[in-house]
Design a protein with these regions (language model features):
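Short alpha-beta junction capping motif
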Residues: 6, 79-120, 301-342
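An acidic, glycine-rich "communication" segment
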Residues: 26, 32-36, 46-47, 117-197, ...
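Extracellular/periplasmic catalytic domains that process cell-envelope and extracellular macromolecules
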Residues: 71-76, 101-103, 176-180, 243-246, ...
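Structural recognition of the beta-strand scaffold that forms the well-ordered cores
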Residues: 78-82, 107-111, 136-138, 183-186, ...
Length: 449
């Protein structure tokens, strides 16, 4: 749970982009061209910050900077804000600078001025250039950004949004997530005019109250994720040293259309702890393959994870069916316990095996015996609140039985963050030791069954 009065050290709103950081938080807008390009709503961010000070007891400040004035150190400008109406592009040097800044813990917010399609298209194109390996994806309603302060499941739009063809009442926010953290966010419809306080029905925008609530949530989320991002970065560096460690038994992470890699360090860390815990002279080589690739049959275990909804092609489903029916094990987890992936995974596996059930694995199963005797696991604070305040609970793994052995093992709660010893503040997951023990036991099961 994030303290609702937490102060973000510094906010920098750039005229080309905008930044947020901490103490008596200062923000900055980045300057480029004349005011019409970056400052059509000059009081937008300031109004939001002033309202936050009076209504949610959060103290932020803002300043305006050019991109060249933005520090690559997120401690100096933790959040950047960029708004506009027209096409734009970064230079290769700016893209490299932004990528490093974002991976080191920074965050950038893009606001489409009056729902501008040219500006939105430019953001989508540039983020693909900056993060070719991680697609921009629309956030579903259970994402922590929509619940970090207010519960924002539904919003109010202007008539112009309806005339543009959008009929929903949920917020339309897209993001690039790295290691379970939003690093870049784009609002498809304009938030800034709502913060400014004046909204006309022929503008593609959120109504003021909805814009304010979304803005508060975004900044509260950014604040709570700052310190955590440092730990996640350290875990990634540690994982880099582990890649060459294993070379014997292949474990394959499933690649699919969407964000299939939510954590970069967790799996390698867990694989190393398995060797240390068991003393078994088996090293794991980690591969990343699509289900349609023949190489999956060289791996006794497939690992699959994600945050949001996904779909597999009929070819991928047929290949996965063949793999499991021939003795392979699919181990999947809903990273951070996100409900979008949970629903999609259950629908997918049921469509492949309609006559079978994904049942909860009983506590007396061998799966919970070796190499760790597991009767209960610790949970994250988010999951604790759902279980009536219990800090520990029986492990919840689900399995699909194939002739006396599990061909599918699934966790609806996040494990990978625990493997990295850095669960997200918003995760519905298992704590560090519990996640490692479950992961080790699943690996042992795959080797012995």
């Amino acid at each position: 749970v994030v303290p609702r009065h937490e102060v973000l050290p510094h906010v920098a709103a750039l005229l080309l982009a905008a930044g947020i950081s901490g103490a008596s938080a200062q923000s900055a807008k980045e300057l480029y061209g004349n005011d019409i390009y970056w400052n059509a709503t000059p009081n937008d961010v300031n109004n939001l910050l002033k309202s936050m000070k009076t209504e949610v007891d959060a103290n932020f400040q803002m300043d305006a900077r050019r991109m060249s004035e933005v520090s690559p150190n997120p401690e100096q400008n933790p959040v950047l804000f960029r708004s506009g109406h027209y096409n734009f592009s970064y230079t290769p040097e700016q893209r490299e600078k932004l990528r490093k800044y974002l991976l080191d813990g920074g965050m950038i917010i893009y606001n489409t001025g009056l729902g501008s399609q040219p500006f939105y298209n430019s953001v989508v194109r540039e983020l693909k250039e900056i993060f070719p390996e991680q697609p921009l994806q629309r956030l579903t309603s259970d994402h922590p950004i929509f619940h970090s302060y207010y519960d924002v499941d539904k919003v109010q739009y202007t008539q112009a949004v309806r005339q543009a063809g959008f009929r929903g009442d949920e917020p339309w926010i897209e993001a690039v997530e790295i290691n379970c953290r939003v690093v870049a966010l784009v609002s498809r419809w304009c938030m800034a005019v709502g913060w400014q306080g004046t909204v006309q029905e022929d503008w593609q925008a959120y109504q003021p109250d909805s814009a304010f609530r979304i803005g508060v949530n975004i900044l509260n989320y950014a604040s709570s994720m700052r310190a955590w991002a440092k730990n996640a970065a350290q875990a990634m560096k540690f994982a880099d040293k582990l890649k060459a460690y294993s070379d014997s038994v292949s474990m394959t992470q499933v690649v699919y259309d969407g964000v299939w890699k939510t954590r970069h360090a967790g799996l390698p860390v867990m694989l190393q702890t398995f060797n240390a815990r068991t003393g078994i002279p088996v090293k794991f080589a980690l591969k990343e393959l699509r289900l349609s690739e023949a190489g999956i049959y060289d791996s006794p275990i497939l690992y699959m994870t994600g945050h949001e909804h996904f779909e597999l092609s009929s070819e991928d489903k047929a290949s996965l069916k063949k793999y499991i029916e021939n003795g392979g094990l699919l181990f999947a987890e809903s990273c951070c316990g996100r409900k979008g992936f949970d629903a999609a995974f259950k629908a997918m596996i049921t469509s492949i095996f309609p006559s079978k059930k994904l049942d909860r694995i009983p506590l007396d199963s061998i799966l919970f015996k070796e190499p760790n005797e597991i009767k209960a696991v610790g949970v994250t604070e988010g999951l604790m609140q759902e279980s009536g305040g219990k800090a520990r609970t029986e492990p919840a793994l689900f399995g699909m039985d194939f002739g006396g052995h599990y061909g599918v093992i699934y966790s609806p709660f996040g494990l990978a963050g625990g493997w990295e010893m850095s669960q997200s503040p918003y995760a519905r997951g298992i704590n560090d030791s519990g996640a490692l023990h479950l992961g080790q036991n699943i690996l042992m099961y795959s080797l012995t069954n």
